[in-house]
Curated annotation (Swiss-Prot):
InterPro entries hit by this protein: AAA+_ATPase, ABC_transporter-like_ATP-bd, ABC_transporter-like_CS, P-loop_NTPase, PstB-like
Gene Ontology annotations for the cellular component aspect, listed alphabetically: plasma membrane
Alphabetical list of PANTHER family matching this protein: ABC TRANSPORTER I FAMILY MEMBER 17
Role description: Part of the ABC transporter complex PstSACB involved in phosphate import. Responsible for energy coupling to the transport system.
Name this polypeptide is given: Phosphate import ATP-binding protein PstB 3
EC number: 7.3.2.1
Reactions it catalyzes: phosphate(out) + ATP + H2O = ADP + 2 phosphate(in) + H(+)
TM regions (residue ranges): none
Record-stated family: Belongs to the ABC transporter superfamily. Phosphate importer (TC 3.A.1.7) family.
Location of this chain's protein in the cell: Cell inner membrane
Length: 268
């Protein structure tokens, strides 16, 4: 049975997941997820491959809707709004809840246009030069690219490209930034820079990060959710939440034996 210590004291809950079940066709991928995401904190999702971490992450900004066989039961609230209500526009959800993917994926455009493109699509009417600079500064990239804004985003190093993607997400003024293993394709120095950036960003944004790196989860997050997977009689695999608590508790004093085994490296 999952341990979900989701009482967040005075911290406001920005995303609330209630009794969520996720299906791909007839296949149950995630079962009975209850989870609160606190505002202006970093929440890490950890667990073995196939346990549904990225699936849940993509439920938050409705990217899974793009998969024809996807179906969700239960509710996910963004404040008081059910994100899966019929009157909710998925495009607006994705503006408010941004996404940074596993591998850097800059648009085939200039550094400047990588930032400006999404803002233009979303009807931004302000000073575009100021928005580009502000977004790049927030992503700790401005000083490195300010003299080459018209160069291709693809000309940057891998770590710079990932920070460009973070700046691109920031430019459309989201409240939440989802990160799906954002450092898995980066070298250790670039990884450290992104981790430092995550600490800075949580002052203004709520961040949810999926990571297979236990040390990274311990370093960057305030709360950690551990997911596991169990086999079915038909050969399938169902992901479920084992334990959710303050990161320090998950790593130093977990309540569930499976959590203790995973964070200590006994399985996974």
């Amino acid at each position: 049975m999952a341990t979900n210590t989701s009482t967040l004291n005075s911290t406001e809950t920005v995303l609330r997941t209630e009794n969520l079940n996720v299906y791909y066709g007839k296949f149950l991928a995630l079962q009975n997820i209850w989870l609160d995401i606190p505002k202006n904190k970093v929440t890490a999702f950890i667990g073995p491959s196939g346990c549904g971490k990225s699936t849940l992450l993509r439920c938050y900004n409705r990217l899974n809707d793009l998969i024809e066989s996807f179906r969700a039961e239960g509710k996910i609230f963004y404040y008081s709004k059910n994100l899966y209500a019929q009157d909710i526009d998925p495009v607006e959800v994705r503006r408010r809840i941004g996404m940074v993917f596993q591998r850097p994926n800059p648009f085939p455009k200039s550094i400047y246009d990588n930032i400006a493109f999404g803002a233009k699509i979303n009807g931004y009417k302000g000073n575009m030069d100021e928005l580009v600079e502000r977004s790049l500064r927030k992503a700790a990239l401005w000083d490195e690219v300010k003299d080459k804004l018209r160069q291709s985003g693809a000309s940057l190093s891998g770590g710079q490209q990932q920070r460009l993607c973070i700046a691109r997400a920031i430019a459309v003024q989201p409240e939440i930034i989802l990160m799906d293993e954002p450092c898995s394709a980066l070298d250790p120095i670039s990884t450290l820079r992104v981790e430092e950036l995550i600490h800075e960003l949580k002052e203004q944004y709520t961040i949810v990060i999926v990571t297979h790196n236990m040390q990274q989860a311990a370093r960057v997050s305030d709360r950690t959710a551990f997911f596991n997977v169990r086999p079915t009689e038909t050969g399938g695999r169902i992901g479920y939440l084992v334990e959710y608590d303050a990161t320090e508790s998950i790593f130093n004093n977990p309540k569930q034996e499976d959590t203790r085994d995973y964070v200590s490296g006994r399985f996974g």
